[in-house]
């Protein structure tokens, strides 16, 4: 029901979630995957995890503060398999000293993988943080290097 509404009324996806408290839920994951954007999203994720897709074409709408959106737009410019530091990302948005704020903004990215915050690492070469868990960030970086 919700998947149909989102697919028909909007040209973007910002989040797929179940909000049981508000009585908004998908009946099954199959409902999401087989309809509209969900089908295309599944295809693109399958391709990504097979190293056959290097960027996503799913329309998205970034929802956040102007600073967060600026950070997330910068993330979308980082090429598949490439990493940059939080400091480099801060420099790319015009404020080299804001690397901690950049890291904080990246941590609030709700569209990880599509908006690839996993490609940003600490200035010293360490992996840095990742809201989904460090092991997921490591997996994604290794996947993009072809090392699964």
Feature roles, as predicted:
Residues 1-15:
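Short alpha-helical DNA-recognition segment
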Residues 9-12, 25, 98:
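Short coil turns linking two alpha-helices in DNA-binding domains
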Residues 26-42:
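DNA major-groove recognition helix of helix-turn-helix/homeodomain DNA-binding modules
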Residues 34, 44-97, 143, 147-148:
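Basic nucleic-acid-binding alpha-helical/helix-turn surface characteristic of O6-alkylguanine DNA
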């Amino acid at each position: 029901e919700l998947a149909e509404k989102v697919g028909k009324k909007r040209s973007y996806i910002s989040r797929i979630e179940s909000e049981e408290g508000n009585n908004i839920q998908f009946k099954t994951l199959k409902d999401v995957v087989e309809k509209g954007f969900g089908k295309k999203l599944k295809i693109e994720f399958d391709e990504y995890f097979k190293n056959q897709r290097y960027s996503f074409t799913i329309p998205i709408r970034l929802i956040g503060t102007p600073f967060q959106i600026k950070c997330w737009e910068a993330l979308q410019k980082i090429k598949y398999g490439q990493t940059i530091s939080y400091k480099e990302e801060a420099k790319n948005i015009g404020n080299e000293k804001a690397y901690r704020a950049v890291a904080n903004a990246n941590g609030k990215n709700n569209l990880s993988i599509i908006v690839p915050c996993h490609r940003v690492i600490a200035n010293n070469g360490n992996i840095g943080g990742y809201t989904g868990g460090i092991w997921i960030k490591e997996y994604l970086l290794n996947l993009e290097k072809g090392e699964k």
